[in-house]
């Protein structure tokens, strides 16, 4: 069995607003269902750490960034659609490729 990739993600939010909390909860649900044990998520409140938002050129919240594996991908705004989040971060392709590799060949 091949080793699974580890995904490093950053979620930039602006305080504990309903929109920020909804984005965080939706994202955690997606990650726990699809990538349990193979991800690290760092939540950055841009109101408390504006220097991090500036360094990473974050212009709007919520913004989700996939840092590793490359390439870096970002989604800005609504994170409620699981498929759009996975496609936007290039994670759906990884998920499909892995399932094809694991189940694609049948022995007769």
Swiss-Prot record:
<dbReference type="InterPro" id="IPR039022">
    <property type="entry name" value="KaiB-like"/>
</dbReference>
<dbReference type="InterPro" id="IPR011649">
    <property type="entry name" value="KaiB_domain"/>
</dbReference>
<comment type="function">
    <text>May be a metamorphic protein which reversibly switches between an inactive tetrameric fold and a rare, thioredoxin-like monomeric fold (KaiB(fs)). KaiB(fs) binds phospho-KaiC, and perhaps clock output effectors.</text>
</comment>
<dbReference type="Pfam" id="PF07689">
    <property type="entry name" value="KaiB"/>
</dbReference>
<comment type="similarity">
    <text>Belongs to the KaiB family.</text>
</comment>
<comment type="function">
    <text>Component of the KaiBC clock protein complex, which constitutes the main circadian regulator in cyanobacteria; it may modify the ATPase activity of KaiC.</text>
</comment>
<keyword id="KW-0090">Biological rhythms</keyword>
<dbReference type="InterPro" id="IPR013474">
    <property type="entry name" value="Circ_KaiB"/>
</dbReference>
<protein>
    <recommendedName>
        <fullName>Circadian clock oscillator protein KaiB</fullName>
    </recommendedName>
</protein>
<dbReference type="InterPro" id="IPR036249">
    <property type="entry name" value="Thioredoxin-like_sf"/>
</dbReference>
<comment type="subunit">
    <text>May undergo a major conformational rearrangment; in the free state forms homooligomers. When bound to KaiC switches to a monomeric thioredoxin-fold (KaiB(fs)). The active oscillator complex is probably KaiC(6):KaiB(6).</text>
</comment>
<dbReference type="GO" id="GO:0007623">
    <property type="term" value="P:circadian rhythm"/>
</dbReference>
